Amino acid sequence: MEGLHIFNGFSGSSEARARHAAHQLGIPLHVADVTETFDEEIVQYLTREYLVARTPNPCVVCNRKIKFKTLLYYADRLACHFVATGHYARVFHNRQTGRYALLRGLDQAKDQSYFLFLLGQEQLSRILFPLGELTKKEVRSVALTMGVEAVREKESQEICFIPDDDYKTFIERHMGSSPAIPGDIVDRSGRLLGSHNGIHSFTIGQRKGLHIAAPRPYYVLAIDREKNRVVVGHEEEQGFSGLIVSGVSWIDGESPREEVFETLVRIRYRHRGVSSVVCPLSAGDEICPATGRPADHEEAGDKLIIRFQEPQRAVAPGQAAVFYSDDRVIGGGWIEQGIPLD
């Protein structure tokens, strides 16, 4: 068994903790410096998405383009067939079909399968998730029994490379030649309610930081990039009946046989999921809910329409929509547009 620490340029003291854990386990530790690739694939992606009024999901992209790619590269160099990570998820191998399924972790409160929907069959065939069958409490107990003291540290809920979870400052530091442009904050009727210092500071469903003096709280309903304005409304105005996704990826490598099917859709990490109907957005014969007119070929592409069985809040373009059948991840895609309630 070999250990690997992936250094992304922001890891701080994590390498020292990794070395200490490797020493306690009695295994060698290798260090992969992915600083340059991480900046290109993750930091620039995150900054670019916020600047075009989308809410990125760097953890999903990192798992596909950085973490597992690096792990498997080093595994090949070290003649190791399998790689293991601390994700709370499970992999099931169907020996009859030869296919691999990605399942939720047994600890539903810690399940991380949402972040792994871009993994494919080749990757899943070599991945082990030993924590997937355990609860967080059981993991701590086993680790302490083995003498791994790192589990005593407070668990961070922040993105690993953004200090103090301060997205605004981080983005402004990496914007380069794309300065933030001040604009208006308006309600759905266009009534001016306030001003902002750049749309990169906002995401759908946001309540804090609007600085609007009003007897009732406002929430971000939409971010209008073309007019450089933030549209807000009250809680009852936040409902969405569905969404459109693009860049769809299927765990099996193939889409479901049924063109229209029912599934559970999660639209963010802490979202419990909503029963939904999924169907393709077809050019010409389908009204695009985002525009109110027939979709053209460019708009349709490989996009899907998801219709919620119950209205949902905070459908943020740029986030992942992940499809489940019970505990099994079917696939997912990127939210292009929420469909407001009529």
UniProtKB/Swiss-Prot annotation:
It catalyses: S-sulfanyl-L-cysteinyl-[protein] + uridine(34) in tRNA + AH2 + ATP = 2-thiouridine(34) in tRNA + L-cysteinyl-[protein] + A + AMP + diphosphate + H(+). Signal peptide: none annotated. It holds the Pfam family tRNA_Me_trans_M. Its main location: cytoplasm. One of its GO terms (molecular function) is ATP binding. It is found in: Cytoplasm. SUPFAM superfamilies: Adenine nucleotide alpha hydrolases-like. Catalyzes the 2-thiolation of uridine at the wobble position (U34) of tRNA, leading to the formation of s(2)U34. This is tRNA-specific 2-thiouridylase MnmA 2. It comes from Syntrophus aciditrophicus (strain SB).
